[in-house]
Amino acid sequence: MRKTLLLAGVVCLAAANASAFEFNPYVAAKAKYALARNEVKVTGSYEGKAKLNDNVFGGSLAVGSTYHLMNGDFRFELEYTKNADAKKRNAKVKTQGVLFNVYYDFDLQNNIPLKPYVGAGLGWGRAELEGNGSVKDNGVSMQIGGGVNYQISEHFAFDLGYRYMTYGDFDKEYHFGPIYEKDEYKPRAHEFLLGVRYEF
């Protein structure tokens, strides 16, 4: 009898956990307005700094899964993101990246369709600087930010957010006879995003 009751208790607990921990795959697309803040630092025989700042548009696509908990949701996704070229005088910077992101959506309860969220991501970034010559390289890309989701139906949600994004620091060294130069590139962006998500 005790074994039967214990087994019944385990089954009930598993059922309760299953109902409290559900997940659904989703696809998402976002448009963004990015305040590109790119810096080049030169050291060696010559020293100096240059900033290539511009405001550009961009976009991203993502696939992921939402894990529904009792007091909020976790979202895990793989995202590809790209910005339009940031230009200044005769130079321009191209940036793109692939990120693995983790978000937490806060449930405000009381049937409110708004869910604030925070999130961070880590992945691969690529930047290309074109001017008198061309320099391009890959590096570690990171993002951190937050925003709010608006659930318009069971499957669709709008997303309004902000994030600080890095596209991978890298450097290049040059030797011209006795002249040595090292250029350090730091592509950054403050990004404001508007997106839509479809959850299956």
Describe the function of each predicted region:
Residues 1-24:
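Cleavable N-terminal export/targeting peptides
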Residues 19-67, 122, 191-199:
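Short glycine/proline- and aromatic-enriched beta-strand/turn motifs that initiate or cap beta-hairpins
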Residues 21-27, 33-35, 39-41, 52, ...:
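Transmembrane beta-barrel domains of bacterial outer-membrane proteins
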Residues 38-42, 80-86, 152-200:
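Predominantly the C-terminal beta-signal and adjacent terminal strand-loop region
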Residues 59-130, 190-200:
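Gram-negative (and chloroplast) outer-membrane scaffold detector with strong preference
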Residues 98-100, 118-123, 138-148, 163:
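Hydrophobic alpha-helical segments of small multi-pass membrane proteins
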Residues 130-131, 171:
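Conserved catalytic-core motifs of eukaryotic protein kinase domains, centered on the activation segment
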